Amino acid sequence: MSSHSQEPVGEENFDDSEYDRPSKSQVKREMHALLDLGKELVELSPERLRQLPLEERLYEAIREAQRTTGREGRRRQIHFVGKLMRSAPAEAIRAQLDTWRNGSREETAAMHRLEALRERLLKDDDALTAVLQRNPDADIQHLRALIRAARKEAAANAALSQGQEPQRKQYRALFQALKNLSA
């Protein structure tokens, strides 16, 4: 027999008001996330860093980490950046980094859509009608002239012998006109 009495441990006896703070593991995960964010910031150019909402001390610590060449010194400086990140607006910084990453994807997708539209315009006259319906203020004569010139250029390029450089001037001009329409 044991000399001390034990109360049964059950949910009815559990008082969670003492444990309203995050667990130690959760705090460590958050600190590692801030450290990783700090590592990302160290990889940015000074121009990009200036666009972020960083305190002067954090900015200088990041610049110092960028200048540090020794492996251990750089690691320690990055950890210092991670420590300073605790008081930084991490969500605003993450949002800006995501915008930079995904913005370029969106731009690339828009360029691909314009290239596909250009190809449709060169192959099918009905595609021009669709473009004009979406952009009623477009200069019809200018677009038709660009399409004719690009088609003529493509026909001339098809007749080139091996090794000759194809002309792409009208092809690019049509793309620029479509890009200006979408802007």
UniProtKB/Swiss-Prot annotation:
GO CC, any one term: cytosol
Superkingdom of the source species: Bacteria
Biased composition (Acidic residues): 9-18
Record GO terms (molecular function): ribosome binding; rRNA binding
Compartment list: Cytoplasm
Keyword RNA-binding: yes
Alphabetized Gene3D superfamilies for the sequence: PSPTO4464-like domains
Pfam families reported in the protein's UniProt record: DarP
Signal peptide location: none
Residue numbers spanned by region Disordered: 1-27
Protein family (similarity comment): Belongs to the DarP family.
Name listed for the protein in its UniProt record: Dual-action ribosomal maturation protein DarP
